[in-house]
Amino acid sequence: SGVRSPLELAGCENAALTQSPVTTGNPTQWRIDVIKVPLAAPETASVVSQPRIFTDPATGAFNGLQNTLPGALHPSGTAYSPLPNTNTCHDVTAFPEIGLLAGACQGNGILLDISDPVNPVRLDQVVDKNFAYWHSATFNNDGTKVIFTDEWGGGVRPRCRASDLP
């Protein structure tokens, strides 16, 4: 799916997916929105920060994680790329008691320090060439492990047979 049009939601800036470093503008991709929701007045919820959690610390490129343009289709012919361009998160799971958030973000699994929830910091990221699309992130009960799942291995079209190519 694409980013909303600025005509639909003010402030949306859609950037083209590219392998060149993106370091200017304010594209809606390559960030998350941190939203504060007062429990006593949820109607006053507001975006309090928009951290660029995919940024390459060495270059400052917003698109600093897996940055591969779509590749070959799955042998079934479905339009899924085994080389996603990491520009959004599909699923994030917070474990506030230990100050961590795990994200399944298209081509990467990420771990964020949320001890300061308004200003999360990426601690680490992983990539697995056998994952087509990082789908979900779940902590174990004590928060010492994160389990990531792949869209192809679950969701609406599981592909877990030996004959299925990664």
Regions found by a protein language model. Give the residues of each.
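Feature marking well-ordered beta-strand scaffolds used for ligand recognition
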Residues: 1-166
